[in-house]
Amino acid sequence: MFRGIYKGSLPPIDPSSIHHGESLADQLQDKDYYSVGWNQYFDQSRDIKLPGTENTFRIYESNVDVVDNGYLFVFLHGGGYTSLSWSLVVDKIKKKNLEKKVRMMCYDCRGHGETKTSDDSNLSIETMVDDCANLINYYQDIIYKNEGGGGGNDDDDQKERLKVIIVGHSMGGSVVIKTSSTNRINNLFGLIVIDVVEGTALLALSSMKSILAKRPKSFDSVKDAIKWSISSNTVKNIESARVSLYFINNFFFFFLTDWFSGLSKEFLSSMALKLLILAGTDRLDRELTIAQMQGKFQLILLPLCGHVIQEDVPTGPKINI
């Protein structure tokens, strides 16, 4: 799975994914701002209610016929985004993965998208870690008990289960790191974190508050939301903006310090295979810089893109994953 990464044999980023010189907004016309449906990128969508709770999570899936002898990728979006920020990455992985050994699931975190919980405003890291571990394990149970996947208690059958790789961007990266450190996810194999590092995240919290204060709380139309995302450089890929920005309300968002505290140490302590994807070396803090030089995790840099790497340059995360 990670062999190509460790051999350093990855191809270069597709230059067509990055716009140089004239801004993307200047290149687009009014007719270019339109929305597309999630079903152009995913196989299906459904809601999963966790047993014993009032929490119902919206999930999007691809390659749902993969139930054993392969990998299960679970994607967690960043704060203020939804599962659909992974649309292009999931679609490109599906089209590249001709042998269909990879199943993919994205879910809307609480307080985001179409997920409904008993307390949507509770975005504490402890709560979101509980959500992550409980949902992934329950989702695996659904695969093995209802969809004919590998299951049972004997060791041979256990080996047939899908190996779980959790992928998180920004806030989602914090959640997957801290969930991984609890050892609560069954069959966890890999951990991929996109553009979140403890040191730089904590330093950026004060400036992030002022940025969020200028962010519109709502838009008159989806078209206006897409226009704003491009003109503000929030998203640098019009194709991704068309599918990920399907809503016009509830754009308010905030950050909590506990998302990032202790992040570097917990990332390094995880027993899973670890990959960190960043938009630049300036995002590395001291602890991770030293650990990377010691070979404790794999680092991939994708320059020339913004914070939302999986939307700006979907070919980058797709190739690395």
UniProtKB/Swiss-Prot annotation:
Keyword Hydrolase: yes
EC primary class: hydrolase
GO molecular function: protein C-terminal methylesterase activity; protein phosphatase 2A binding
Keyword terms of this UniProt record: Hydrolase, Serine esterase
Catalytic residues (UniProt): 170, 195, 307
EC number: 3.1.1.89
UniProt keyword Hydrolase, yes or no: yes
Gene3D superfamilies: alpha/beta hydrolase
The reaction(s) this protein catalyses: [phosphatase 2A protein]-C-terminal L-leucine methyl ester + H2O = [phosphatase 2A protein]-C-terminal L-leucine + methanol + H(+)
Pfam family, any one: Abhydrolase_6
UniProt-listed GO biological process terms: protein demethylation
Record function comment: Demethylates proteins that have been reversibly carboxymethylated.
Sequence similarity: Belongs to the AB hydrolase superfamily.
Protein name: Probable protein phosphatase methylesterase 1
Organism listed in the record: Dictyostelium discoideum (Social amoeba)
